[in-house]
Amino acid sequence: MNPYRIDEPTAISFSGGRTSAFMLYKCLEAHDGQLPDEAVVTFANTGKEMPETLDFVQACADNWGVDIVWLEARVRRGGEEENKYVYETVEVSHATASRKGEPFTQLIEAKVYAPNPLARFCTKELKVDRIKDYMRVYHDWWTSYIGIRADERRRAVKIHNKSDGSQDQYCPLYADGVTKEHVYDFWINQNFDLQLPNNNGTTDWGNCDLCFLKGKSKRLSIIRERP
């Protein structure tokens, strides 16, 4: 059975990196270049991604002829209570996407503290919940395709083939035995690529620019190169 075949409502979660882009390519390949109507590709922008990441998402759409739904959070004060905040999901595009951290800044103002390894609310509020909001408009239940590789087993086993209460979670790259070496080999042979360093299939510059999950030395290196 092809692990990339889709026959039910599915959200292909595209983070903007090479691995999830490879997952998207394999899904397209499994359907002769045209995703079924049940599938939607989503990219949740936090405003803290590198400009190259946003360009890469658009390049994938253009080169592969696939529609990608760009989503962002809007967090604003709402109601009469002083500390009441409303969380909304809006569609944007490559042209209109936030590039100065606006969604992230709004979230921090609402929470009044920064995310950290013990409270990763940034991922939940800015990415996961935004995709769920969008999917709930069309479906009561769906499967979420997540780009976690076979060499990321500790991450994969926590969510692969598991439900979180509103969606089934599935990691096709993990199921297919794909490693970062496969991702590297794929991208060095394409006519376009993410314009960030390719360190054997991974990059220190991916996802949010100064994410706390990146080591201190990596964050300092990024700051030195782009003050």
What are the residue ranges of the model-derived segments?
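Nucleotide-activated chemistry modules centered on ATP-dependent adenylation/adenylyltransferase
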Residues: 1-227
